[in-house]
């Protein structure tokens, strides 16, 4: 009997960036997934997660976000979910006070986190309520589309994921939630990839490819400029088994320095 096709679930993730001190490198905020989670358990990943119905409710309130001009409902939902999930998973909040051009500072972000993050993660409040009660404007314009990956066909759990770049708000350091993730770190792409090679970190294939791509940039500005100047090519890897090993094929034009990659034994 042929397995029922699994429809990919819309999801978003943000690569939060800051310039490393004393080096020509950037650092990205990453977290270790809890080992009991059924997708990417134990993996080092960027903060993110699924689009939910609450994100759709925010779309209908354009006075609650900036940077939505010219975007359809789908594009808006991916961006709103990216900011919400990043706040839930890291405490970092990409938002402005109403009437201000500046992102909220670390002190205000900490107050909002202390008051609402746990309740939001537990489903006891909504992101819409958090935004309204704190007079916030979600900074969708801070997000730079970077990549679009869809889990291969045939997998039991599939995601249709947009990756965004964003400069981390000044002094917002971030921290894992202790539930879905058990550790967090600001790390250069070089260090993260070295950890994957040594076995210190478990890196999913899309994470590895995006870290390699990101590691070519020497500053946050360079990364944002580079990401904002290129078309996004959707990547849905195709897996093949050959001589006891596995290969993943992705579009060469997606910009990951190759088309066929060895990913371990079959």
List each model region and its residues.
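N-terminal leader/linker segments that precede catalytic domains of diphosphate-processing enzymes
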Residues: 1-266
């Amino acid at each position: 009997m042929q397995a029922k096709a699994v429809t990919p679930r819309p999801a978003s993730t943000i690569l939060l960036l800051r310039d490393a001190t004393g080096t020509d490198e950037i650092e990205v905020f990453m977290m270790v997934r809890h080992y009991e989670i059924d997708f990417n358990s134990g993996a080092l990943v960027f903060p993110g997660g699924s689009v939910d119905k609450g994100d759709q409710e925010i779309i209908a309130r354009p006075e609650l976000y900036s940077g939505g001009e010219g975007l359809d409902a789908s594009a808006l939902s991916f961006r709103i979910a990216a900011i919400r999930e990043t706040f839930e998973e890291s405490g970092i909040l990409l938002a402005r006070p109403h009437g201000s051009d500046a992102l909220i500072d670390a002190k205000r972000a900490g107050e909002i986190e202390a008051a609402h993050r746990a309740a939001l993660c537990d489903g006891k409040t909504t992101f819409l309520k958090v935004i309204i009660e704190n007079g916030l404007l979600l900074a969708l314009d801070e997000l730079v589309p970077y990549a679009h990956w869809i889990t291969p066909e045939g997998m039991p759990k599939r995601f249709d994921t947009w990756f965004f770049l964003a400069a981390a708000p000044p002094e917002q350091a971030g921290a894992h939630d202790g539930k879905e993730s058990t550790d967090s770190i600001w790390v250069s792409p070089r260090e993260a990839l070295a950890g994957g090679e040594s076995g210190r970190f478990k890196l999913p294939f899309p994470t590895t490819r995006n870290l390699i791509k990101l590691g070519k940039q020497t500053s946050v500005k360079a990364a944002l400029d580079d990401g904002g100047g290129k078309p996004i090519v959707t990547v849905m890897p195709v897996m093949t088994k050959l001589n006891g090993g596995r290969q993943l094929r992705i579009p060469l034009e997606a910009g990951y320095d190759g088309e066929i990659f060895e990913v371990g034994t079959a």
